[in-house]
Amino acid sequence: MSNEKASTKAPKFAYPSKKKYCIFCSEKIDYIDYKNVERLKRFMTEKGKIIPRRISGNCARHQRQLSTAIKRARYMALLPYVVK
């Protein structure tokens, strides 16, 4: 009489995922402009949240610049804080 249950979950990593790369490094962009709203929208969810680095594939430097640019654009009312 053991209390162990049979595991029916699939393995978490069934296949190796594709290597993500920083779009800004590949295009050799040094400064992310907060006025370029179309580029910033690509790194936000439909609810207006910033997509994390592990999903977007950005390097640490550009992810910091990206979050600062999005926050500046929100403050200047170029991007919404929350989308309903």
Curated annotation (Swiss-Prot):
<protein>
    <recommendedName>
        <fullName>Small ribosomal subunit protein bS18</fullName>
    </recommendedName>
</protein>
<dbReference type="InterPro" id="IPR018275">
    <property type="entry name" value="Ribosomal_bS18_CS"/>
</dbReference>
<dbReference type="Pfam" id="PF01084">
    <property type="entry name" value="Ribosomal_S18"/>
</dbReference>
<dbReference type="InterPro" id="IPR036870">
    <property type="entry name" value="Ribosomal_bS18_sf"/>
</dbReference>
<keyword id="KW-0689">Ribosomal protein</keyword>
<comment type="subunit">
    <text>Part of the 30S ribosomal subunit. Forms a tight heterodimer with protein bS6.</text>
</comment>
<keyword id="KW-0687">Ribonucleoprotein</keyword>
<dbReference type="GO" id="GO:0003735">
    <property type="term" value="F:structural constituent of ribosome"/>
</dbReference>
<dbReference type="GO" id="GO:0006412">
    <property type="term" value="P:translation"/>
</dbReference>
<comment type="function">
    <text>Binds as a heterodimer with protein bS6 to the central domain of the 16S rRNA, where it helps stabilize the platform of the 30S subunit.</text>
</comment>
<dbReference type="GO" id="GO:0070181">
    <property type="term" value="F:small ribosomal subunit rRNA binding"/>
</dbReference>
<keyword id="KW-0694">RNA-binding</keyword>
<keyword id="KW-0699">rRNA-binding</keyword>
<comment type="similarity">
    <text>Belongs to the bacterial ribosomal protein bS18 family.</text>
</comment>
<dbReference type="InterPro" id="IPR001648">
    <property type="entry name" value="Ribosomal_bS18"/>
</dbReference>
<dbReference type="GO" id="GO:0022627">
    <property type="term" value="C:cytosolic small ribosomal subunit"/>
</dbReference>
